[in-house]
Curated annotation (Swiss-Prot):
Keywords: Chromosomal rearrangement, Methylation
Record's disease association: A chromosomal aberration involving OFCC1 is found in patients with orofacial cleft.
Positions of transmembrane segments: none
Segments of skewed composition (Polar residues): 36-48
Source species of the chain: Homo sapiens
Name of the protein this chain belongs to: Orofacial cleft 1 candidate gene 1 protein
Length: 231
């Protein structure tokens, strides 16, 4: 009996303790709900609320970028954008280069090569025209012209022929060097052999000046056409 009484008494004490702790917690929650837990955001009468809100707004504005196009343009607007620059993006890739983009060294070398080729071409055409005009129809006419020619004119024509032959050989040597250094990609050994035989035939044609003259003029014309198409 005493044991049962002791157990009942212990149960009552635990129930009282639980009820007291529950009442204490409920009172504390009600007090926090009415007064706030020290956070100025829950207390509308606190003077720190406006300062906290402005600080949060500043932080948010600093962290988040502006989404509008006007703000983006104002941020990244350059000071020199007001100066007229013209239609920069309207220029095509294949348009001729501007003055500031041209390399003066490359331009000078190309101009000098064009001048040399033009002078050489004019000399060859002049020599070719003179030879065609002065060539007789038969051997009798050739003998008469040779007998009637003065020594001064013969010397002059000999100098012109010599100068043209020297220029022709110089251009031919340069052309042969450039052709020998070229290696065609994907070319078979047969094609390379054909190319080497064509170079040997060109060397053999050195003894025939008119064939050589025609070939050199064709090369110069092709180079001039390529440059005109390029620029």
């Amino acid at each position: 009996m005493e044991r049962e009484k002791f157990q009942q008494k212990a149960l009552k004490q635990t129930k009282q303790k639980k009820s007291k702790s529950a009442e204490f917690l409920m009172v504390k929650e009600d007090r926090e709900a009415t007064e706030g837990t020290g956070n100025p955001a829950f207390n509308m009468s606190s003077p720190d609320l406006s300062a906290c809100q402005t600080a949060e707004k500043k932080v948010i504005r600093h962290d988040m970028p502006d989404r509008t196009l006007a703000a983006h343009q104002q941020k990244f607007r350059l000071p020199a954008s007001a100066e007229p620059k013209g239609n920069e993006y309207g220029r095509n890739y294949f348009d001729p280069l501007m003055d500031e983009e041209i390399n003066p060294r490359q331009c000078a070398t190309e101009v000098s090569r064009e001048d040399d080729d033009r002078i050489f071409y004019n000399r060859l055409t002049k020599l070719f025209d003179e030879s065609r005009q002065g060539e007789p129809q038969d051997e009798s006419g050739r003998e008469e012209t040779l007998n009637s020619e003065a020594p001064g004119s013969s010397n002059k024509s000999h100098e012109i022929h010599k100068e043209a032959s020297e220029a022709t050989t110089a251009h031919l040597e340069e052309f042969q060097r450039s052709q020998k250094t070229i290696i065609l990609l994907g070319s078979s050994p047969l094609e390379q052999e054909i190319r080497s035989t064509s170079l040997h035939c060109m060397e053999d044609e050195m003894s025939h000046p008119w064939i050589l003259l025609l070939k050199v003029t064709a090369v110069i014309r092709s180079r001039r056409y390529y440059r005109e198409q390029r620029f």
